[in-house]
Amino acid sequence: MFVPVVNQKQEPLMPTTPSRAKRWIESGKATPFFKKGIFCVRLNVEPSNQETQEVAVGIDPGSKKEGFTVKSLAHTYLNIQTDAVTWVKDAVEIRRNMRKGRRFRNTPCRTNRMNRKRGGLSPSTKARWQWKLRICNQLKKIFPIEVFVVEDIKAKTFKNKIKWNTSFSPLEVGKNWFYTELEKLGKVELKQGYETKELRDLLGLQKIKEKTAEVFEAHCVDSWVLASSWVGGK
């Protein structure tokens, strides 16, 4: 277990141990605070050493659960499994039906407005990838992160079938938008699914089939392997 540390300018430094953080707080050298449920300390004095090691974030996207790991060569600082955003599609449908009801009451012969089409991501797709980006933004504020290692998921296509994802996929558009925004925070390294499996087998780790289970072997095992593939360590 480690405690994230930031300096007086809110810049992230290398995490410290809980015992050292406690001594800093008791002596007045640091102030405790919480950042999205994570206990952190803010230094009130000039740090003796501001050098940072290479820290990577492993990201394992999923349809129901997602894994995030913050790791350096020597230590694993954070392993979290979050719930993916799955409620936006139903919320948008309810909003659409209520709006349709209001329009029918007021203007029963209303014609379609064909000049209001807009580009961009659909609300449900945008919410899914914005959620991942917000988590990465919060981690970047408390850890000296240099690189994000992401498993590059693919959309399923159907040969000789007229499906919406044969020529267009919200998944592909959403992840490309996410990668573009993530590059503003640091270096982005992509790994294919089979590469993640090879790395996992090389380290002798197992992944369970129950992806919604609240255990390390569900999603965090892959996010840990992805981060470890960049910085190394065990």
Per-region residue spans from a language model:
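Substrate-contacting helices/loops that form the catalytic groove of nucleic-acid
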Residues: 50, 71-234
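Gly/Thr-rich phosphate-binding beta-strand-loop-beta motif of the actin/hexokinase/Hsp70
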Residues: 53-72
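Charged, flexible boundary elements
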Residues: 16-51
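A generic structural motif
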Residues: 6, 46, 69-71
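Hydrophobic residues embedded in beta-strands of well-ordered beta-sheets
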Residues: 3, 30, 38-41, 66, ...
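Low-complexity, highly charged intrinsically disordered N-terminal segments
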Residues: 1-17, 28
